[in-house]
């Protein structure tokens, strides 16, 4: 809906309240981030926990559940990856990737302590304010669950603000089930 206050790609670097992200002078500028942790989710799927190198960027970066960043590997290229963190837990950003393409394979070779670049956030966040005091059903499949993980985290941390929550996630095999440690 055009009247929604959730920001979108036309205003990168904004948070879900329509307030400009104050972390960067230019939201298109690549910000260096250190890999703090690398978590194996399933075969060829990993979550990278990142921390911005610059403290001002770390303090000022805001995003809405459902937005994504452009993740840049120096000398290789960049790829759009969903932010799978709760925006209410600042300081660290989680991004889950399937290691299949040239850029994601380069990301997959990185280790904790290595640095990559981030631009964003981009996209329209999920309309979670509209779901307050209502039941929520989330339906996903495969790695398609990544864009809603931030929303799930957000809802779980504010459980008293939402009705019943049902998550239906389809996968080929039990080994393909992602985020077990996070949601079990």
Question: Where is each model-derived feature located?
Answer:
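Ferredoxin-reductase
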Residues: 19-114, 171-173
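Charged, low-complexity, helix/coiled-coil-prone segments
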Residues: 11, 50-59, 90-97, 126-128, ...
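Accessible peptide chain termini
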Residues: 1-3, 16
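FNR/FR-type flavoprotein reductase catalytic core
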Residues: 3, 9, 102-184
């Amino acid at each position: 809906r055009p009247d929604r206050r959730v920001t979108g790609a036309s205003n990168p670097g904004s948070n879900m309240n329509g307030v400009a992200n104050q972390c960067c002078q230019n939201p298109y500028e690549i910000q260096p981030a250190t890999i703090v942790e690398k978590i194996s989710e399933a075969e060829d799927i990993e979550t990278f926990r990142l921390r911005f190198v610059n403290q001002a960027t770390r303090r000022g970066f805001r995003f809405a559940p459902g937005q994504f960043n452009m993740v840049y590997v120096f000398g290789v290229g960049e790829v759009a990856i969903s932010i799978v963190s709760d925006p209410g837990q600042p300081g660290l950003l989680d991004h889950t990737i399937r290691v299949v393409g040239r850029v994601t394979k380069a990301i997959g070779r990185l280790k904790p302590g290595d640095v990559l670049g981030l631009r964003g956030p981009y996209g329209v966040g999920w309309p979670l304010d509209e779901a307050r005091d209502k039941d929520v059903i989330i339906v996903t499949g495969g790695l398609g669950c990544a864009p809603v993980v931030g929303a799930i985290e957000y809802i779980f941390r504010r459980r008293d603000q939402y009705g019943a929550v049902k998550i239906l996630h389809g996968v080929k095999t039990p080994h393909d089930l992602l985020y077990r440690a996070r949601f079990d």
